């Protein structure tokens, strides 16, 4: 990470938005969005041309792979990213009024 200008350290997670109305029925209707402030900032800075890196931990699962694909497509350095073999990537359940 010698040439990195900004290192973003922290969380990468999925925001799982439930249906409008406040019902927590995530079995049938929800939308997933890749998120987490440090992950978003790393991608945003890279998109603006800065040399950014993300340091955090993802699960060895399909969501973790989506994050890796996103970081790679944006040019974010993930050489210090940790992949946890037995725990999943975090999901935050969001109830909407």
Kindly give the residue locations of the regions a language model identified:
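Conserved donor sugar-nucleotide recognition element shared by glycan-biosynthetic enzymes
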Residues: 34-41, 63
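Conserved strand-loop elements at the edges of beta-sheets that form or border functional pockets
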Residues: 8, 35-36, 83
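Beta-barrel outer-membrane channel/assembly domains of diderm bacteria
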Residues: 15-16, 40-48
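Conserved N-terminal subdomain of the carbohydrate kinase-like
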Residues: 51-97
């Amino acid at each position: 990470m010698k040439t990195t200008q900004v290192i973003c350290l922290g969380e990468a997670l999925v925001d799982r938005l439930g249906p409008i109305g406040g019902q927590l029925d995530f079995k049938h209707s929800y939308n997933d969005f890749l998120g987490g402030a440090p992950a978003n900032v790393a991608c945003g800075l890279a998109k603006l041309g800065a040399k950014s890196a993300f340091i955090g931990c993802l699960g060895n699962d399909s969501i973790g792979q989506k994050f890796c694909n996103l970081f790679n497509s944006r040019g974010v350095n993930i050489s210090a990213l940790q992949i946890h073999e037995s725990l999943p990537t975090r999901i935050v359940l969001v109830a909407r009024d």
